[in-house]
């Protein structure tokens, strides 16, 4: 991160998948200046059916004045609205997807520090267990340990049995399981 910062750059952490590191490390300590978190992936908020989703953004203090405003600010145990000096202003009508963010906060408070510390470890453990089971039927795209997610490829099933990723996804839904992302490009 120091090389980027020395060149005048900023580091952005795509916290869409914090699952594997939650409770174990903090992106800000790794040198990242801006972090977003898709709450539905890590903190048990709804996302199905197109939303409502929520992706709060956290920044280092030197970027605070550039955040969209207004921001709730706590001064002397009283909350007020604060409009950052260099803000582009409001990004969303009213208060955004406030209830989704509140639900994530309640989930984190219920887990507590100890529960949050276990959250990442369990995400990795669950993904590795599931990948070992899935790989008995559908080969994994990569032969290496996964963290909180893995990619399976039905390329061979398509050739041998004309079964597509879409078919597997629909079969999972029929059995009551949420279908994973299908047709994920393996070049990512």
For the regions a protein language model found, what residue spans apply to each?
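Conserved PLP phosphate-binding loop immediately N-terminal to the Schiff-base lysine helix
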Residues: 1, 8-45
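Residues at alpha-helix termini
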Residues: 7, 30, 136-137, 175
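Generic non-transmembrane alpha-helix signal with a bias for helix starts/N-cap capping motifs
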Residues: 20, 116, 127, 164-166
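Terminal amphipathic helices with adjacent charged low-complexity linkers/tails
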Residues: 137-168, 173-188
């Amino acid at each position: 991160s120091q090389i980027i910062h020395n060149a005048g750059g900023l580091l952005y952490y795509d916290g869409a998948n914090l699952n594997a590191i939650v409770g174990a490390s903090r992106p800000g300590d790794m040198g990242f200046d801006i972090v977003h978190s898709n709450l539905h992936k890590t903190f048990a908020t709804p996302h199905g059916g197109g939303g409502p989703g929520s992706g709060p953004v956290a920044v280092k203090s030197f970027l605070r004045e550039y955040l969209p405003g207004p921001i709730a600010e706590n001064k002397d145990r009283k909350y007020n609205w604060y409009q950052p000096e260099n803000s582009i202003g409001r990004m969303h009508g009213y208060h955004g997807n406030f209830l989704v963010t509140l639900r994530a906060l309640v989930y984190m408070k219920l887990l507590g520090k100890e529960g949050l510390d276990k959250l990442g470890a369990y995400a990795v453990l669950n993904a590795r267990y599931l990948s070992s089971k899935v790989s008995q039927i559908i080969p994994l795209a990569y032969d290496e340990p996964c963290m909180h997610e893995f990619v399976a490829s039905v390329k061979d099933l398509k050739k041998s049995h004309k079964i597509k990723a879409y078919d597997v996804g629909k079969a999972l839904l029929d059995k009551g399981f949420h279908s994973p992302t299908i047709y994920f490009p393996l070049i990512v």
